[in-house]
C-alpha cells in the first residue's frame, strides 16, 4: 500500500502475441494483446499502446497509443484500427525516465534498412546519459526523452558485418547488449517475427505462454498438440484470461525468436566477469501480481513465506493479525498462521479511489485516509492488532491509519513490515523517491514507532527476505540443497544470496552493475 501511495511505482509491462498456423489467422490478435495488457495494468497506468502487423513481406504496421488506462485507450472503435493482423506487441507505461506525455508512449516504431521494427521496453538503462550522447554524436536524432527510444535506435543501427540483403537481428541485439548491460526486457516485432529479449542480468521479468484451444485451457493434465499462437509477457498473470498456458521464463541474456511455426532460442549472452544474476527482488515483495510465476514459484507463495519468516523474527503478544489492503494480505496470512493468531480484516478499501477520483478540496484532503479506507471496528474494539504492510516508504500514510484504528477502538497497533527498509533509489526501472525522502534515512527512523504512533514497528530482515524468496528455487546448475541457503545464526544467508542472484540494491546499496549517473 505504501509503495502505491507514495511514489514507488511499478515500471512498465510488455506483451506480444503471434498467431500460429496459416495466415490470415482467425485469432483476434488485437483483443488478445488488449486483455494481456489489462493483466499488466498494475505495472503502468499512465499510457498504453499496441502495434500490430499482417506479417507480409512488406508489412503494414497499425499503431494506436494513448494516455490513460488500457480499457480507456482501447475502445472497440480504436481496436478496429488494429484488425487484419497476425502478430503484434503492446505496452503499459509508468515513466521512470522521460516525461508522462504521449510522445513517450510505447511501443516505438522506427524504419530500418530492412523495414520497420516496433519495440516495447520494460526497465531503465543504467548508462542512458552516455548512450544518448553517443547516438547524438553519430547524427542519430532523438525525438523523445525516453531511453526506450534509444534502444530502438540502437536496434536500427546496422552492424558493419551485416549484408544489405541479409539482416542479422541477433547481431543487432547483441550489439545492444554490449552497449547497454541493463536493465531491460524487450519485445521486438519485425515483419513476421517477434523477438523476446532479457538483459544478461535478468533484472526485469519476461515469460512465454502458449495459446491453447479454448476446450483445453483449464485441463492442465491434457497435453494438446494444437497451438493457436504464442504470447510473451512481463508476467504470467494474464495468461488464464486469454486462454494461454505458461511455458517458461526467458532466461537472463536470452534472445528468443517467436514465429508462426514456434519458438526457438537464438543465443544466450553471458554476463561480464562472471557476475551473478540480478533479478529484482521487489518483484516478489510488491510489484508483481500474486498469481504470477517467477523462477518456478508463485509470487503469492513467496509473500506468504515472508509473513511466516516475519513471525519468526518479530513475534508480539496480540489478539489478531490484519493487513493494509491488499498487496500485503498473503504475508499477513503467513504471519497469522505461523504465530497461531486469527487473521481478521480491520480495514476495507474503497477500490474506486485512485487516478479517476475527483481532485479533493481542502476538507477532503484533511480527511486523508478516511476517503480510501473504511473501518471494520466491530472486529477489533478493545483488541491488540498486528498490522502487516508490504513496505513503509515515507511513513506519512501508515501513521494516519494507525491513528484511525486507535480512535476506532484498537487497544494496541503493532506494525510488522514484510520487507526490509528501503534505503537507496533504484536506477534500473523502478521509480523510488530520493534517498533523503526515505523514512529509513531520516532521524525519525531510530524512534519509528513513536513517530508513527504505533506500539511497535519491526521490518523483515534482508536475510529473511532472501531466504523466503530462495528456499524453493531449484538451482539446477549449482545443485544446491535447501539447507545451503537457510539463514544461519552467523548470518551467512545474505552471503550465499550474493552467489545466486537477486538484486537488493534498494535495500543494501549494492548495485549489480556500475551506474553511470
From Swiss-Prot:
PANTHER family: AMIDOPHOSPHORIBOSYLTRANSFERASE (PTHR11907). This is Amidophosphoribosyltransferase. Residues 1-11 form a propeptide. The lineage of its organism: Eukaryota, Metazoa, Chordata, Craniata, Vertebrata. Residues 12-261 form the Glutamine amidotransferase type-2 domain. Its EC number is 2.4.2.14. The gene is Ppat. Binds 1 Mg(2+) ion per subunit. It comes from Mus musculus (Mouse). Mg(2+) binds at residues 327, 389-390. CDD domains: GPATase_N, PRTases_typeI. Its cofactor is Mg(2+); [4Fe-4S] cluster. One of its GO terms (biological process) is 'de novo' AMP biosynthetic process.
